[in-house]
Amino acid sequence: MTAILMNASLSIAARGAGIALCLWLPVSSQAGQAPAAADPQTVAQYLKQAKASQQPARLLGESEQDGVTVRSYSFVSQRWPGLGSTLASDAPQWEHVLKLALPPERKRGSPVLLYVSGGSNHAEKGPQAPRDPLPIAELARGLGIAVAELYYAPNQSLKLDGQPAGREDALVAYSWRKSMDQPEADRFSSLHLPMTQAAVAAMDAIQASLPDARAFVLSGSSKRGWTSWLAGLNDERVQAIVPVVADFWNIRVNFTHVYNSYGKQWPVALRDYDRNGITGEVLNGSPGFDALLRFEDVVNYPKSMARLAKYMISASGDDFAVPDSAWSYLPMLKGPMQLRYLPNQSHYVGSKQVAEALRQFMGRWLAGKPLPEASVDGDERNGRISVSTREPVVHARLWLARNPDRRDFRLRSGIRYQEQPIEGKCRLGECRFEFTPDAAQPGWQAYFIEFEGKDFTWTTPPLIWPKRYPDGSNVPVAAPRLQLGG
């Protein structure tokens, strides 16, 4: 039986999901889990279809914040569900608010930063804007470019097929179930498709207001980070992405690893997916799930991702992924990329942290500076992590957490990362940093190295030592040499 892991000591039984596969092989596959063949056409086909029901933006008003002009627009991104879906919705017309901040010194033709945000436009008490909006005026003033925030991606709460009103993961999980059960009739039923169209339509609305804007950087958190990925992979106006807490890729391998890490239990964050039987599909697979992943899983877009600059922000105490999840997909990603893991941070990252990460990335990207280059190695014999870089480092810190009882480093577990300085050995302009975990410590250790430069902060992906699951089976963690930067 599968189970949902509620916290460090409590679990509840859930639906049966078969036998998990415990061997985590290097690069891209796990025993019996060959990656799904790519299907890059489904998203593009949906975007083409949805555009027919898109409506132009309407200016709602204009204000000034410390010299920055902020315009508010409303627009309709699409009608969903439509053709290619048997879903029924109580609110098929997707409506949005778009905030656009324009600094006085903005240069014509400069790129636009678009942050995809949430909120609830169908809440019982009326529309509710995102609880923690991005400080777009402050970012626009500091960067000298237009910065926008898209509200209501997805539209919610929604009643799908007469079900009780749902939002966020409840909507995604139900829409996935439909898509998996009828891969052809419901090929456009995944909620991520209209979310992606919402971002694409927002770029159209921005260009209608700023005809000289031709390039975009997209960002968003969690499923909106997923949206940033899919929009960036399918719309060439997007030149860079900054996805936040979107540690999902190589989905079957990644989340089988999550399941085994928690002693063959699912974290409570995945409860909606467990209720809809999707966790069982992760472990056992099915033609319908494979068809879904062909266009949902970004590892299936190697050519498209190579042109995107990627700064991926993750949480060391994430509620969905485990700290070393990234090793299941990072070797499969192409093109320029850097990482930043936030210590002692859950899946729910505040707008101030997001804004600071965006400020650093955009400042460097606008200046034409490549992302810091580094080589990262993990030694599977003793857990040693080694980093070589020529990027000037102002401060280097090791973040180390120990759990004597469980392979669990979620913030909710009570385990905290401790900071300690780490010195590099430098020769001919290249510095090497190393850390080896103490094998005498009981339980498990999670660790990563953070590098703070003059204008940019980046980290290694975390490792966990020792290489075993709670049931004693080995975890030959795929830690091949990673080349970051570019």
Language model features with spans:
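N-terminal cap/lid segment of alpha/beta-hydrolase-fold proteins
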Residues: 50-106, 150
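Short beta-strand element of the alpha/beta-hydrolase
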Residues: 109-119
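Cap/lid segment of the alpha/beta-hydrolase catalytic domain
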Residues: 121-123, 128, 137, 145-197, ...
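Gly/Ser-rich "nucleophile elbow"/oxyanion-hole loop immediately N-terminal to the catalytic nucleophile
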Residues: 181-197, 201-222
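Glycine-rich nucleophile elbow surrounding the catalytic serine of serine-hydrolase chemistry
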Residues: 220-230
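Hydrolase active-site cap/lid region
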Residues: 230-281, 340-343, 349-353
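Serine-hydrolase catalytic core
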Residues: 287-343, 389-394
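Surface beta-strand/loop "capping" patches
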Residues: 360-400, 418-425, 429-430
